[in-house]
Each structure stands twice: as structure tokens, then as C-alpha cells.
Amino acid sequence: MAHKFVVTAFLTGSRILGRSFVAAYKQAQAASAYQRAQVKAGNTTGGASLSSGMTLDEACKILNVKPPAGGQANVEEVLSRYKRLFDANDPQKGGSFYLQSKIVRAKERFEREIGPLREKMEAEAEIKEGFKPKVYKD
């Protein structure tokens, strides 16, 4: 009689555990499919913002700069705004560590966005000017 109860409890527990694993797998598949659809639909910045959780628009609003259009971005302006805001929010001067970390994440997000564009522009400029190796004379 006791073995019947143990077997029933084991089977019921196994069924519950199996259903929960199936539900978790379906949820993970749906999230993965959604992410692939976002990337395929042209939202290529979605994958880049996963690590910081910040969009490019949010980063531009925090740093109070215009979003880079066609690879044209004023890097000096971004860095000067970053330094000014970072120093203004120094916790030892009465600022907020939370705001300071948001400013750092905004700069990192902006750099991650314009990094490949800058490399591409530098490569095009090098091709246009021709390859000029640095020659060292002893």
C-alpha cells in the first residue's frame, strides 16, 4: 500500500517537473525568435544594447548630443560632455554614483555605435589616399 503512494507521488512530481521544463523551453525559444526577428527587421542596434541595456537614443539624451547620422559624429563634443557630466556627478563632490554610472554607460554605448563606422571611414580614407607605410630609418 505504501509503495503505491510513493509511486503515485513520484509520477505526479515527475509530470509537474517535466511540464515546467517544457514551459521554460518554449519561453526561451519565443524570446530567441523575437530577438532574431528584431535583428532581421532592421533593428541591428538591439543586439548591441543587450550588454548595457541602453539604446543609442537614450545615450544621446543623457550626453545631450545628436545621434550620429551616416557615421558622422562629433566625438570631441561627446567626450567633452562626458567629462563635464562625469566630474559634475562625482560622489565625493556631492554628486550621484548612479548618475555617474549612467553617464559612463551612455559613453560606452555611443562608442560602441560609432566604433565600426569610424573604422570604416578610416579604411576608406586610407584607400583613397593610398597605402603609405611608416618607414623607420636608423
Swiss-Prot record:
Keywords tagged on the record: Membrane, Mitochondrion, Mitochondrion inner membrane, Protein transport, Translocation, Transport
Any single biological process term in GO: protein import into mitochondrial matrix
UniProt topology in membrane: Peripheral membrane protein
Tree of life domain: Eukaryota
One GO cellular component term noted in the UniProt record for this chain: TIM23 mitochondrial import inner membrane translocase complex
Compartmental location: Mitochondrion inner membrane
Region (J-like): 58-115
Cross-referenced InterPro entries: J_dom_sf (IPR036869), Tim16 (IPR005341)
Main localisation: mitochondrion
Domain remark from Swiss-Prot or TrEMBL: The J-like region, although related to the J domain does not stimulate ATPase activity of mtHSP70. It nevertheless mediates the heterodimerization with the J domain of PAM18 and is therefore essential for PAM complex function.
Function per UniProt: Essential component of the PAM complex, a complex required for the translocation of transit peptide-containing proteins from the inner membrane into the mitochondrial matrix in an ATP-dependent manner. In the complex, it is required to regulate activity of mtHSP70 (SSC1) via its interaction with PAM18/TIM14. May act by positioning PAM18/TIM14 in juxtaposition to mtHSP70 at the translocon to maximize ATPase stimulation.
Quaternary structure, from the entry: Heterodimer with PAM18. Component of the PAM complex, at least composed of mtHsp70, MGE1, TIM44, PAM16, PAM17 and PAM18.
Protein family: Belongs to the TIM16/PAM16 family.
Stated name of the protein: Mitochondrial import inner membrane translocase subunit TIM16
Organism: Gibberella zeae (strain ATCC MYA-4620 / CBS 123657 / FGSC 9075 / NRRL 31084 / PH-1) (Wheat head blight fungus)
Name of encoding gene: PAM16
